[in-house]
Structures are given as C-alpha cells and as structure tokens.
C-alpha cells in the first residue's frame, strides 16, 4: 500500500504542501503527499489571483528556485498586470487573475508528472514522535505511515471553525471537514499553539450583474508573465475585471447585522489579517469613509462565478445579500454562496529554525498558515523551502537558508523566526530593507544558480539566466562606452524638458536622468543599430535600463548588505546562557533564551532586544 518508509511525508495539499512535495520529490526523495481530498489539491480558497505587491516578487523567486507556482500561474492566467509601474522598479509587482478550476487542475497535472511522488487521501490525526524525533504520521483510519521527515502544511484546517452570522460549525473550508488531533499531539509534545482568523467574501452569479454601471479594470496592453522559463508564454487574450463601490446605504444595511456578527458579539476572539479586513471591520474602523472599493473578479474563462474582492464578511447571509443588492451594478445580484470567517490553530513560528524545522522535534517542518502567515504566495514559498530542507536533511546535506538580502522569501522566514507574529502575516515591499536588490526582474540572477547547484533548477534554466545576465551587462557596457553628440541628443532632451548638453556625452549619463527613459535613447541611431544587430529583446533592454538608472541605489544597498553579512557571520553558541550576562536587560534575556538566534544579526532583529543589549553580548562573546 505504501513504501515501508518515505524520505518525506507532506501533510496537506494546498499551496505550501504542493510546493513542498514537488521540491522534495524533484530532489530525489521518496515523497508522500497526504490530503483529505485529492479532488481539492491546490484550491484557491479565497481570491482567484496570484501575485500582487511583494507577493509577485515571491512567485518569481519560487520560479527562479525551481518551484511550480509561476508556471501554473502563467498557464492558468486570465489577466496580467504589473502593479506599481508608476513607481521605481523595486516596487513593480506582477499579478495575475487566475482561472480557479484550471489552476487546481494544472497543479495536479504537474504533481502527477513529478517522479518520486505518491499520493494518499485521508485525514492525518496525529504524529509518531519518539525521543524528540518524528518517525511518521497516524491517520484517522488507524494507519501508521513511517517517514524520515514530515512537513505539516495544514492551512486553515486545524480545528477549523466557520462563522456565518450567529451560526458556527466545524470545517477547514466551505464544504470540507476540519482536521482534528494534530494540534493536540503537538501541544502534548511541548509546542505552544494559538488561534487566528481569516475570512472570504460571497461568490455571486456574474450573469446577474450590470457591468455597464461599473468601471472596467483591464489587463496590461503588453502583458508579461511570472516564469523565467520558456515553457510558458504571455497572455494573448485577457478577461476584464470591474470595479464598483459601496455607499452609505450599504454601510447602514451592514450595520443592521452587527449585533449578529461574530466579530462584534464576542464569538470570534482571534485576530484577523490587518491588511485584508472584513467589510464590517472597514466600515466600523473607517466610519468617516463614504465608500469602499469593490473589485469584481471573474473566477475563470468559462464560468459565470464572480469573486467580490473587498467584501470579505462573516455577517448573516440575509444582511450580506441585502447589502450587496444596494451596490451599484449589483441591484439584481444572485448568490452562489455566502461569505464566511474561519478560525483555526497555528503555532507561533519562533518555535522554528530558519530551515522551517521545529526546534523541539527533529525532522518535523511547518509551512504556511500553520506558521501564522496569510496568502497563497507566502504559503507556497514556505512550502518550497521546507520541502527543500526536509530533503537535504534526509540526504545529510547542508540546508538552504536564504538571507534578507537574497530574497523576499528570506525576509519572510527571518521575520517569522526572529519576530514571531500574533496576527496573520503578509509580505509587503516595506518589510524588505534591501528591496532595490530584491526586484521582481532579477530573481533568476539571485536564486537560479544556487537552485541549480542543489539540483532543482535545470541546466537549461541556468543557461537562459546566464544569457540574460551577459546580454544585459553588455548593453550597460555599451551605454557606458558610447557617446552621443549634442546634435542628436538635444532634440530628445528638449522634448522631455530636461537640460541640453553642450558637448559629447555618454549615453549612460543621458539615460541616468529621471526624465529620460529607454524609449528615448532608442531614438539614437547607434542605440537602435546595436539593438537590431544584436537581437536584443525587451527583457534585456528593461534589465539594462534598471541597471543604469538605479546603479547608485543598488551599490548603496549592496554595501549595507555586506555589513549585515558580517554580523550574520558572527555565530552564537547553540546553548549559550544569556542569563549569565548581568548587564543585559531582563526582556532581552527572556527573548533571546526563547528564540535562540543563531547569529548576532538575527539577535539584533528580535523585538525587545536593544542595540545596547547586542553590544553587551558582543563584548561577552569576545567579538
């Protein structure tokens, strides 16, 4: 029925579980993916979209590391947008609207085509743990399946409790059972657990909406894609989304249900995602606002089901329906299903190492919402890293730990491990101090070489990345070496209302001006000839432009990152006794003793540990 013992067992087949299973199997480990329903692999439980601000960077990093999310997202996209294009490239974030059903189907097809990967459908009810080491899992039918390592990616299923108005019932997602037993086993083993909350909006019948009353939200005219590989192509055709607004009337109707709202009557005590509040939370917290945006998002190419982005709610169904019917364009709306809130168990992530292995139990890894994060992309990236590190541990190889200056994934995991979280954590560009280095356009430069060394990213991917890097560097060198005369440069400079040049100048210097962009220098004959003669594509041109315009910022961040690296190299002994340092604050001693940072750099990022505490620690360690 099963192998006698698997190298890696992955529990849960959401975004984290799928990436974990794929990574482990692709690294040559015998892998078992266990889920409560094989029909629900890689479900988009909430919005039908991938990417977005900072999240798009994460999807590109997953792809650069050899994960599947970028390819699946490209192959099932119905619309593409590059967000924040009006800002600098450090802020550009790709996002796709997805075909929900095709997304899950594509994930399953890719997993079924992955060697070394087995599947099993059943609820996992507990862990097999001996002498602080995981040995496998127990199922609800009483089976024991042995594994050298286990990755838990349970999403919202651990003791999940769904709320709609004054109704509540167990469930991990609408129409699916919650998972029981795992939390209890882990708490018994010494883990600390907590509760979090998230929510989702109603789904409605698009045939009942009047789109003529809404604003059209179209995709990019020249769409890009997530994957750096050549196995996917940018969209040729796209579906529009739409935008409408709530109103004071809608807000008044929603307030009618507050006394029956689990958020306001005390039934829900857990904290929800700060940056994705429910509609009732928005009108309560921002009572001065007359309206809130609602994005009307199709769920696929061939379905009339629509996701009402911005209307997450746990209010009673009748209030949800009445309020939506008062929204412009929704006057005749028909419901497919009501919105709801869900509470679930999580485990404070300060109990993990940077590999996502638990400190308490050897061979046990956590990834996704079990660690207190929210979002498909955050979950998928953790799953990928947990799957990689579980496989590397089995093979007795060094783990893969991404630093804060190497990837948003590194920032995410470091934040979780060193700071913890008491509310659902989502990634933002503002969380990354080296975001100019961590752009969406260069994730392949940053991560594909190390992934290729591991055996995840193929040689073909590496060659493609090296070609892009070499050609963009040649283009930058051309800009630095090639001069332009005032006769040719000034007409362009005048048109852009920037100072003329009085003598021959380098194209690099001209392009460095904020008023000048790539389309301007392409008007210069020598640039146009270089591009034509060398078949320079748009991706390489954009990469070269970024390197020119932001070279100063990039150099400054690299210098700061090198300083951080020096602190990362200063190790703290594993069992160091912080209580012996009398001049360190009590709070710092407590936090450091609990989190057990591996390096001085990690210690400095822990909340409650001051610079003076770090100075004392450095002196004590003789550094």
From Swiss-Prot:
One of its GO terms (cellular component) is cytosol. GO terms for biological process: tRNA methylation; tRNA wobble uridine modification. It is found in: Cytoplasm. Gene3D superfamilies: FAD/NAD(P)-binding domain, GidA associated domain, C-terminal subdomain, tRNA uridine 5-carboxymethylaminomethyl modification enzyme MnmG/GidA. SUPFAM superfamilies: FAD/NAD(P)-binding domain (SSF51905). It comes from the Bacteria. Its cofactor is FAD. FAD binds at residues 12-17. Keywords: Cytoplasm, FAD, Flavoprotein, NAD, tRNA processing. InterPro entries: FAD/NAD-bd_sf, GIDA_C_N, MnmG, MnmG-rel, MnmG-rel_CS, MnmG_C, MnmG_C_subdom, MnmG_C_subdom_sf. NAD(+) binds at residues 272-286. It holds the Pfam family GIDA_C_1st. Its main location: cytoplasm. One of its GO terms (molecular function) is flavin adenine dinucleotide binding. SMART domains: GIDA_assoc_3. NAD-binding protein involved in the addition of a carboxymethylaminomethyl (cmnm) group at the wobble position (U34) of certain tRNAs, forming tRNA-cmnm(5)s(2)U34. Belongs to the MnmG family. Homodimer. Heterotetramer of two MnmE and two MnmG subunits. This is tRNA uridine 5-carboxymethylaminomethyl modification enzyme MnmG. It comes from Flavobacterium psychrophilum (strain ATCC 49511 / DSM 21280 / CIP 103535 / JIP02/86).
